[in-house]
Amino acid sequence: MALKKFNPTTPGQRQLVMVDRSALYKGKPVKSLTEGKHSAGGRNNTGRIVVRFRGGGHKQTYRIVDFKRTKVDMPAVVERLEYDPNRTAFIALIKYTDGTQAYILAPQRLAVGDTVLAGAYVDVKPGNVMPLGNMPIGTIVHNVELKIGKGGQIARSAGTYAQLVGRDHDYVIVRLNSGEQRLVHGRCTATIGAVSNPDHMNISIGKAGRSRWLGRKPHNRGVTMNPVDHPHGGGEGRTSGGRHPVTPWGKPTKGKKTRSNKSTNKFILISRHKRKK
């Protein structure tokens, strides 16, 4: 998919760069594969803000995407490619030979009419699913499982992928986009190919209103707040905060490591922080 630029008829149009979605299906999603989605506005069940600067935006319908691909050795044909407001990647509607339909993440170079298959040993082509232990070294994959049978968790965003770089007994070594290398069990599955819509990184929203359509509210800095609202707040006139940058809850920001899951550290061979100078 290419990028679209617009004639500068307004200030917002002048800056706007969008992904050309003309090749995607223009109708509504399959009703049986959708769910209603409640707009939480960044609040949790007690009504308190847990994610700041969220709210408003266009009403969305959730598309149920199959991250597990448990229909083994049953071919499916790609019926159409669709836009999904809940994620940056595009999704594909597939129809199995038994007549059931499902949505999957659309990989790059997947076209309408292609056949995809999940199994222990399948062809290495975009959209096919197989255990990591059965893939050749160097394979580009996405939607990678971390726990056997849980469904894909890694490399699901637009344009992302992971690469199989080695084997270690029952495990394989996977290199992620961040530079991290980690061990994943060979029986965990992954989908072959990179995720669709790689041009997502090059879009320009163009105007504040388009951010509001996406449900993003203005992000205001701590130094502009009052002391009751933020550790950086207060002061006479404009101040620089007067302390090392912290979150509204007083925890150091700007890159301090917060990972505390020590039990899974053994699976990380090369940290993503190692490549930062």
From Swiss-Prot:
SUPFAM superfamilies: Nucleic acid-binding proteins, Translation proteins SH3-like domain. InterPro entries: NA-bd_OB-fold (IPR012340), Rib_uL2_dom2 (IPR014722), Ribosomal_uL2 (IPR002171), Ribosomal_uL2_bac/org-type (IPR005880), Ribosomal_uL2_C (IPR022669), Ribosomal_uL2_CS (IPR022671), Ribosomal_uL2_dom3 (IPR014726), Ribosomal_uL2_RNA-bd_dom (IPR022666). The keyword Metal-binding does not apply. This is Large ribosomal subunit protein uL2. PANTHER family: LARGE RIBOSOMAL SUBUNIT PROTEIN UL2M, RIBOSOMAL PROTEIN L2. Keywords: Ribonucleoprotein, Ribosomal protein, RNA-binding, rRNA-binding. Part of the 50S ribosomal subunit. Forms a bridge to the 30S subunit in the 70S ribosome. One of the primary rRNA binding proteins. Required for association of the 30S and 50S subunits to form the 70S ribosome, for tRNA binding and peptide bond formation. It has been suggested to have peptidyltransferase activity; this is somewhat controversial. Makes several contacts with the 16S rRNA in the 70S ribosome. HAMAP family: Ribosomal_uL2_B. GO terms for cellular component: large ribosomal subunit. Belongs to the universal ribosomal protein uL2 family. Pfam families: Ribosomal_L2 (PF00181), Ribosomal_L2_C (PF03947). It comes from the Bacteria. Residues 222-277 are annotated as: Disordered. The gene is rplB. GO terms for molecular function: rRNA binding; structural constituent of ribosome; transferase activity. GO terms for biological process: cytoplasmic translation.
